[in-house]
Amino acid sequence: MSDVYAVDFALDLKASVPSSVLADLRWHLGIEAVGESGAQDPDGEMGDVVPLLAARGPAARIGGVMVGEFARKAGGWSLTARQEVHAELLPELDSLAERLAWNSSTEGVIGHIRFYEEDVPDLLINRSGTLVKTALAPAGTTTA
């Protein structure tokens, strides 16, 4: 058994996003050599942190393809990413998702995360710059 999660992001970032956040995001996407902390080893890793959105090609557990695209647009930036993330990296993923929500111009759903053996994801929602995780209930179940 593997502790892998499917993670998807689809959101826009404000034009005012700080350059340090852009650099960190580019590092996570594998398109910039140094992230926010500025220090890295020869493998492109920064201490115990690894790029979370840099994998490309067929996914090992979640099916489909892992992608990460980041593009300039009028009024800011657009990000789309789909990745497999190991459970031990979830704290770093939460930190990245919080920074994305804080700098996002997209209100509402900005992504979702799902344990690869589960059918139903948790939504990642931006509420005025605050990341809110909402668990969905599978069809036919009731919540209290």
Question: Where do the model's predicted regions map?
Answer:
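Small/polar-rich, solvent-exposed N-terminal microdomains that initiate assembly or binding
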Residues: 25-55
